[in-house]
């Protein structure tokens, strides 16, 4: 409807899951599964909301890298863990920023801020390939710029403290790092699917408002578990931005882990949600 602002559910495609603000909750009996997003939707390219969504993803990922990389550097700068926020503080910074940024951007872009989340939602047919590729490019550019601003403000400290780049820690194999990234991303993307499930949103009108909270908390918990192993990637844009700006050989040695792991984890989460939790393939046959 012209002139009426629409409420975009977190992770939603522009077309099928948008509902006017104030839409009443539906019962299970009345609920109808939203149609899958078209695989390729060139019509989106002529819509301002499409370009605005990408800009929102860029700004959100920019802010995410800026705050989190500064937090990581602050912890590494401290002479001992007791003099800084420590691993718990890093985890809170990552989880808290995701909570805040998903809340801010959910109604504009769906609040992905992570190529793995975008990839998982694309596999579940929640958004088109056009939008998925656009989001991933903007997320990566935002991450590079966010890390670049940190280096611009503190060039010597940035290089000396590792620039927040992800690497597999000494004592762990690449396989261990890959496994940590797969499971960590599975937890995140599974939480995204559960928190933004269209059927749950239709039944319980308060769920979309609360969605940023479990998503941010999932990021917090995964960081607590995997910072000692990989520094916690679970977000290829975050890993890419820090690696490009830091640009040391060892930051690229394991970089593939932080793309392959999150994409596998996201794919498994999408498969689990669609096939097991929602059983959509079986419903279509009946």
UniProtKB/Swiss-Prot annotation:
The keyword Chloroplast does not apply. A motif (NPA 2) lies at residues 235-237. The modification N-acetylmethionine is found at residue 1. Water channel required to facilitate the transport of water across cell membrane. Its function is impaired by Hg(2+). Residues 76-91, 154-174, 230-256 are extracellular. Belongs to the MIP/aquaporin (TC 1.A.8) family. PIP (TC 1.A.8.11) subfamily. PANTHER family: AQUAPORIN OR AQUAGLYCEROPORIN RELATED (PTHR45687). It is found in: Cell membrane. The gene is PIP1-1. Aquaporins contain two tandem repeats each containing three membrane-spanning domains and a pore-forming loop with the signature motif Asn-Pro-Ala (NPA). A motif (NPA 1) lies at residues 114-116. Widely expressed. Expressed in roots, above ground and in flower buds. It comes from Arabidopsis thaliana (Mouse-ear cress). Residues 1-34 are annotated as: Disordered. This is Aquaporin PIP1-1. It is a multi-pass membrane protein. InterPro entries: Aquaporin-like, Aquaporin_transptr, MIP, MIP_CS. SUPFAM superfamilies: Aquaporin-like (SSF81338). GO terms for cellular component: chloroplast envelope; mitochondrion; plant-type vacuole; plasma membrane; plasmodesma. GO terms for molecular function: water channel activity. Keywords: Acetylation, Cell membrane, Membrane, Phosphoprotein, Repeat, Transmembrane, Transmembrane helix, Transport. One of its GO terms (biological process) is response to water deprivation. Residues 1-54, 113-132, 196-208, 278-286 are cytoplasmic. NCBIfam families: MIP. The modification Phosphoserine is found at residue 284. The chain crosses the membrane at residues 55-75, 92-112, 133-153, 175-195, 209-229, 257-277.
């Amino acid at each position: 409807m012209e002139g009426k602002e629409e409420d975009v559910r977190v992770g939603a495609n522009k077309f099928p899951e948008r509902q006017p603000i104030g839409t009443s909750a539906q019962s299970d009996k009345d609920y109808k599964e939203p149609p899958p997003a078209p695989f390729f939707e060139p019509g989106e390219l002529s819509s301002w909301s499409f370009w605005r969504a990408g800009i929102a993803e860029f700004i959100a990922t920019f802010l995410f890298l800026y705050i989190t990389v500064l937090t990581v550097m602050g912890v590494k700068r401290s002479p001992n863990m007791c003099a800084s926020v420590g691993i718990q503080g890093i985890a809170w910074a990552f989880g808290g920023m995701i909570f805040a940024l998903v809340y801010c951007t959910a109604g504009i872009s769906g609040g992905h801020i992570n190529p793995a989340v975008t990839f998982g939602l694309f596999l579940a047919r929640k958004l088109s390939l056009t939008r998925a590729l656009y989001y991933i490019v903007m997320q990566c550019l935002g991450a590079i710029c966010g890390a670049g601003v940190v280096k611009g403000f503190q060039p010597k400290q940035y290089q000396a403290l590792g620039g927040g780049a992800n690497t597999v820690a000494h004592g762990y194999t690449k396989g261990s790092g890959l496994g940590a990234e797969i499971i960590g991303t599975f937890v995140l993307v599974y939480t995204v699917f559960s928190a933004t499930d269209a059927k749950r949103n239709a039944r319980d009108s308060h769920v979309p408002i609360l969605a940023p909270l479990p998503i941010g908390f999932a990021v917090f918990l995964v960081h607590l578990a995997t910072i000692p192993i990989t520094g916690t990637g679970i977000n290829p844009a975050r890993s890419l931005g820090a690696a490009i700006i830091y640009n040391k050989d060892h930051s690229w040695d394991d970089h593939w882990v932080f793309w392959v792991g999150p994409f596998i984890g996201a794919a498994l989460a999408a498969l689990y949600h669609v096939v097991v939790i929602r059983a959509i393939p079986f419903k279509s046959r009946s």
